[in-house]
Amino acid sequence: NEIFENVDPALIDRIYSSKEGIDLSEFDFKDVIHPNECFVLKSDRNSVLARYNPFTHSICRVTKGRNYGIEPRNAEQSFAFEILNDPNVKLVALTGKAGTGKTLLALAAALGKLTDYKQVLLARPVVALSNKDIGFLPGDAQEKVAPYMQPLFDNLNAVSYTHLTLPTT
């Protein structure tokens, strides 16, 4: 993540107090950021997690959201959660090391959209299981893919079901 230092502390204060954000033209780095890019703004006395919103042409504060008992634990997760929960962003690609919360945050964001959509599709990339065809493994199809799908099931179990109420049809 990009860190912009020596930002005017008054601009950072304005970002904290503004719901709409601050117009991009007020920032020196306006020519080097991309739509929906997240970054840290630092001054000598304060800092803020921020994002460039291309729809409003403004720099907005990234807030620590929460869906179904799941909330970000660090700046990177806060950035991911912000973008995942923005209805104007149609596609999000998260990359990073295993175990950093990408799938869990994506699942929590998806569950937050159940009022707008009928289902959540949870998938894993298709890869050969240790270079063996699944047909040669012992057991039925569910037993064969269970170890491969377990990380997804673990993430589902991590969601607090006390917060989960599925829409009725």
Q: Where are the regions that the model predicts?
A:
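Interdomain "pre-motor" coupling segment immediately N-terminal to P-loop NTPase/helicase cores
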Residues: I3-R61
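Conserved adenine-nucleotide phosphate-binding loops and their immediately adjacent elements
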Residues: C60-G69
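N-terminal pre-P-loop "Q-motif" helix
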Residues: I70-P87
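Hydrophobic anchor at the beta1->P-loop junction of P-loop NTPases
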Residues: L94
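P-loop (Walker A) phosphate-binding loop of NTP-binding proteins
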Residues: K97
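Conserved glycine(s) of the Walker
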Residues: G101
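Conserved P-loop
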Residues: L105-Y161
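Conserved small/polar residues in nucleotide/adenosyl-binding loops
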Residues: T162-T168
